[in-house]
Amino acid sequence: MWRVRKRGYFGIWSFPLIIAAVCAQSVNDPSNMSLVKETVDRLLKGYDIRLRPDFGGPPVAVGMNIDIASIDMVSEVNMDYTLTMYFQQAWRDKRLSYNVIPLNLTLDNRVADQLWVPDTYFLNDKKSFVHGVTVKNRMIRLHPDGTVLYGLRITTTAACMMDLRRYPLDEQNCTLEIESYGYTTDDIEFYWRGDDNAVTGVTKIELPQFSIVDYKLITKKVVFSTGSYPRLSLSFKLKRNIGYFILQTYMPSILITILSWVSFWINYDASAARVALGITTVLTMTTINTHLRETLPKIPYVKAIDMYLMGCFVFVFMALLEYALVNYIFFGRGPQRQKKAAEKAASANNEKMRLDVNKIFYKDIKQNGTQYRSLWDPTGNLSPTRRTTNYDFSLYTMDPHENILLSTLEIKNEMATSEAVMGLGDPRSTMLAYDASSIQYRKAGLPRHSFGRNALERHVAQKKSRLRRRASQLKITIPDLTDVNAIDRWSRIFFPVVFSFFNIVYWLYYVN
């Protein structure tokens, strides 16, 4: 009994296989090729490709499948990506149903020109083409119930609007929009054939700069002025790989910034070395910025990598300005400070000499139309014996209020008491004539006194020359270098600490 039931089950399950084998053999049999030809001719005879299936009835449902072969390129400059795929559409056309042959008929690609096909197009397409090697890559397959499978091998360049504010730590969403060009939702409907399994090959894609994190399928309807149209969307979520940019941009920028700090350890008086190092690092950062801008579109907002490169550029530029500050203190502010101190001391000495000079009486004498002011001893007790008198004069000119206008020059003059008595007693003796430039000592015209006048003038000239030498030495006197060294020492700590803080804030903000 059990054997009989077993044989019965075997007969039930094997009957369809036998029928299919017989039909297949009949189809492949050259004697039955005429039957296949007659079936195809009958289907195409009287077929009107101008009318959609079920014209005037319910909308035809078109299911779609995509098998992605590769994503060839993602361009930030052109804001697009290139995709190669096997695009398949399936719909049912009752006019193409048959029951004579219980098998699918795969026909030549040229038959597609004689059948109705959906007017599908890619909404965000920039440039597309159907491959034609060795023949046009199209497929038409008919099923007995009238289902038509239409396949194409297409390469399309689709627009992908990117937000590059976080570049190169960004994630982008690139979509492929599929829509009917002429038929509205009253005539045609689109759906993903196989639901979530409608798109395959995504996990096999490998991109040099991106990783496909996720993808999703979207079905929606869009409304235009001409009606409502069906639309299918395939959205890729792309995450940029940071490894290339770390090696190409970030690491060189970090190393160049650190290199600019080497100038803090170079001696402050080595101007050529520090300036050359600073300018070289600044120009290198400028070159990196320029190269980066050439590989990106001209967008109005600031990108993440722009923030980093600008930060590095600021640090490099500030290192150069640090030496400018050191150089200013070393060669500029120090001598100026010393000069001001010297002028202040000279002013104090002038004020002191002004008070001392007020103790000397002046006597105005007019001789030969010229007015002189004579110095004389108010005591008049100069003894005839030889004595040494030291006078501290000021090499000065005086205004009507007797204010001292020039710096102090100490003049020590040793003369005989007899000459001093003669000079102070005679109103025509040694006198000072004031003009706008200097002091002139004049004698009373006696030949015997000309030697003393010339000696005094020579002494004054020597003092003037000595004062000029002291003034020239003041300009090259090396100032106190404590502040200069302190700036370099603080810079060695300040720059690395601030740059490290900048990196921590940058990476925490943009990575998260």
Curated annotation (Swiss-Prot):
Which residues get glycosylated?
N32, N104, N173
Q: Can you say what this protein is called?
A: Gamma-aminobutyric acid receptor subunit beta-2
Task: Write down the Gene3D superfamilies for this protein, in alphabetical order.
Answer: Neurotransmitter-gated ion-channel ligand-binding domain, Neurotransmitter-gated ion-channel transmembrane domain
* Main subcellular localisation: membrane
**Which organism does this record belong to?**
Homo sapiens (Human)
Q: What is the effect of changing R293P?
A: In IECEE2; uncertain significance
Q: Which keywords describe this protein according to UniProt?
A: Cell membrane, Chloride, Chloride channel, Cytoplasmic vesicle, Disease variant, Disulfide bond, Epilepsy, Glycoprotein, Ion channel, Ion transport, Ligand-gated ion channel, Membrane, Phosphoprotein, Postsynaptic cell membrane, Receptor, Signal, Synapse, Transmembrane, Transmembrane helix, Transport
- What functional role does this protein have? Beta subunit of the heteropentameric ligand-gated chloride channel gated by gamma-aminobutyric acid (GABA), a major inhibitory neurotransmitter in the brain. GABA-gated chloride channels, also named GABA(A) receptors (GABAAR), consist of five subunits arranged around a central pore and contain GABA active binding site(s) located at the alpha and beta subunit interface(s). When activated by GABA, GABAARs selectively allow the flow of chloride anions across the cell membrane down their electrochemical gradient.
Q: Kindly give the PANTHER family that the UniProt entry links to this protein.
A: NEUROTRANSMITTER GATED ION CHANNEL
Query: What tissue specificity is annotated for this entry?
Result: Isoform 1 and isoform 2 show reduced expression in schizophrenic brain. Isoform 3 shows increased expression in schizophrenic and bipolar disorder brains while isoform 4 shows reduced expression.
**What's the impact of mutating T287P?**
In IECEE2; loss of localization to the cell membrane; retained intracellularly it affects the cell surface expression of the GABA receptor; decreased GABA receptor activity
Q: Where in the cell is it found?
A: Postsynaptic cell membrane; Cell membrane; Cytoplasmic vesicle membrane
- Binding-site list for 4-aminobutanoate: Y181, T226
Please report which protein family the annotation says this sequence is part of: Belongs to the ligand-gated ion channel (TC 1.A.9) family. Gamma-aminobutyric acid receptor (TC 1.A.9.5) subfamily. GABRB2 sub-subfamily.
Q: Which PROSITE patterns match?
A: NEUROTR_ION_CHANNEL
Q: List the disulfide bonds.
A: C160-C174
Q: Name one GO molecular function term.
A: GABA-gated chloride ion channel activity
State which residue ranges cross the membrane.
242-262, 273-292, 311-331, 491-511
Using the UniProt entry, name the condition the protein is associated with.
Epileptic encephalopathy, infantile or early childhood, 2: A form of epileptic encephalopathy, a heterogeneous group of severe childhood onset epilepsies characterized by refractory seizures, neurodevelopmental impairment, and poor prognosis. Development is normal prior to seizure onset, after which cognitive and motor delays become apparent. IECEE2 is an autosomal dominant condition with variable age at seizure onset, ranging from early infancy to 6 years.
PTM annotation (Phosphotyrosine): residues: Y441
Q: Which residues lie on this side of the membrane: Extracellular?
A: 26-241, 293-310, 512
InterPro entries, per database record: GABAA/Glycine_rcpt (IPR006028), GABAAb_rcpt (IPR002289), Neur_chan_lig-bd (IPR006202), Neur_chan_lig-bd_sf (IPR036734), Neur_channel (IPR006201), Neuro-gated_channel_TM_sf (IPR036719), Neuro_actylchol_rec (IPR038050), Neurotrans-gated_channel_TM (IPR006029)
- Entry comment, domain topic: The extracellular domain contributes to synaptic contact formation. GABAARs subunits share a common topological structure: a peptide sequence made up of a long extracellular N-terminal, four transmembrane domains, intracellular or cytoplasmic domain located between the third and the fourth transmembrane domains.
Q: Which reactions fall under this protein's catalytic activity?
A: chloride(in) = chloride(out)
